[in-house]
Amino acid sequence: MIQNVGNHLRRGFASMFSNRTSRKSISHPESGDPPTMAEGEGYRNPTEVQMSQLVLPCHTNHRGELSIGQLLKWIDTTACLSAERHAGCPCVTASMDDIYFDHTISVGQVVNIKAKVNRAFNSSMEVGIQVVSEDLCSEKQWSVCKALATFVAHRELSKVKLKQVIPLTEEEKTEHGVAAERRRMRLVYADTIKDLLTHCVIQDDLDKDCSNMVPAEKTRVESVELVLPPHANHQGNTFGGQIMAWMENVATIAASRLCHAHPTLKAIEMFHFRGPSQVGDRLVLKAIVNNAFKHSMEVGVCVEAYRQEAETQRRHINSAFMTFVVLDKDDQPQKLPWIRPQPGEGERRYREASARKKIRLDRKYLVSCKQAEVALSVPWDPSNQVYLSYYNVSSLKTLMAKDNWVLSVEISEVRLYILEEDFLSFHLEMVVNVDAAQVFQLLSDLRRRPEWDKHYRSVELVQQVDEDDAIYHVISPALSGNTKPQDFVILASRRKPCDNGDPYVIALRSVTLPTHHETPEYQRGETLCSGFCLWREGDQMTKVSYYNQATPGFLNYVTTNVSGLSSEFYNTFKACESFLLDNRNDLAPSLQTL
């Protein structure tokens, strides 16, 4: 249906306006003049590093498959070299985001690892890694995993200020834009776990029959490693990948003690390096099964370091959580025994493992799946608010980064672009004589939108989630052909620029709340992705860009109003400009933090 609507719109616009031009320059590079060749044959990201390794028997586990520990060492090395190529100085691993392993790699196959810097901040940078396995005989290739790592540049005598990454391709622009939101998500991860345990009821099953349960203490593992020169990089610091490999080893032993079989690692929760380790350090690795679910188990691993045996104070180096399964001969997960945690700290870890499992499921659904697979309205609750906000902002930035927008019409310096891919999307653009911070403050409060947008009859603030996220209940007039007015429950996520050249962002998407069910009085509407991106255009000038990814409910309105679509959008946007000009002087006290 969407494709037919797209064809209808294309013919309608073509008959109304001629000489449509492709939008060639919608991006806003951060600094410098980018090379003329952005895509096509021969282009390669200047920070890209590739590694190819033939899997030998010495790299494998009992199943003849590549050891995940060995893979982590290769991943870390490749990513570090990419980071150092951009930084021009030594770099150390700060963290590694969640990794989901989709396929195993067998002896004789080739591992192809590709890493590139997505974005640089002040002294840290996000590196994206892609791992593909290759069968040389059949010439088939499989995606094994994707990973995101954070590296910190380090110089002995001076403070590092990294140069900015200038994205050129559509993929690079998307990753660059979303990297800031991912960084925000990493910083609040610990608080997310605490909030979930505080405000949500976690089913812990601690009262069930203990007779057939395995005591968690039976799975406890402790192992020590002496850091030798081969374990360290060219700076004398222990390889992050080597530490991760040691952690995977003790975690596998702990998992095996629960299931009395050979487990398979399926996912790794975020690695976060809290401090460095050098040659000569003794690393103490501790692992224990925190919780066992029906077909999977979570193992917690902790790494501490000390220099001399006489030292009483150990340094906390790293912690991580790993998810294991036990596969049968058909590669299907087997049922696992229940685990009985120790009172006190053991029960705390048990409940936190349940909370992390819920977060993983929410995150995997919201972040990992394709946009077309996500429901228009996703249930909102404290356990997934961080990832809903992330998906809200990243969806808008992904739409913004598209490079095949087509200019449909321009009326008095208001431009309307359309994009026909999986969804039909619209983009309006104008420049206003108002400072970007003022525009951001005025447009981010949806309660003021009825002052200029006739499609918003009333707006109620339902919940102020945090300083930058809020949920609103919106009432809109009835669309043509309908007798009922529409209502929406909308999550609004606003973001200030992370760096020079970044836009202010106001992202909107529908959510569902238990306090605001559908009612007979209104027809429930939904929006998948819409919002504003605001760029500074010189002194007191702002480029205002509005994006909307049309949903099925909106498509009917579009198809029945093709002839008046452009003029109505123009009138609404000009009303927005008048609203901004009339109210720009009312915000001086509130702009201090922007």
Curated annotation (Swiss-Prot):
Q: What induces it?
A: By cold exposure and repressed by heat exposure.
Q: Which PROSITE patterns match?
A: HOTDOG_ACOT, START
**Biological processes per GO annotation:** fatty acid metabolic process; intracellular signal transduction; negative regulation of cold-induced thermogenesis; response to cold; response to temperature stimulus
- Which EC number(s) does UniProt give? 3.1.2.-, 3.1.2.2
Task: Identify the coding gene.
Answer: Acot11
Question: Keyword Transit peptide, does the record have it?
Answer: yes
Record's CDD domains? BFIT_BACH
Alphabetically list the UniProt keywords.
Cytoplasm, Fatty acid metabolism, Hydrolase, Lipid metabolism, Mitochondrion, Phosphoprotein, Repeat, Serine esterase, Transit peptide
Which named protein is this? Answer: Acyl-coenzyme A thioesterase 11
Occurrences of domain START (ranges): 370-582
Gene Ontology terms: cellular component: cytoplasm; cytosol; mitochondrial matrix
Q: What SUPFAM superfamilies does the entry give?
A: Bet v1-like, Thioesterase/thiol ester dehydrase-isomerase
Transit peptide extent on chain? 1-20
Domain HotDog ACOT-type: where? 45-157, 217-330
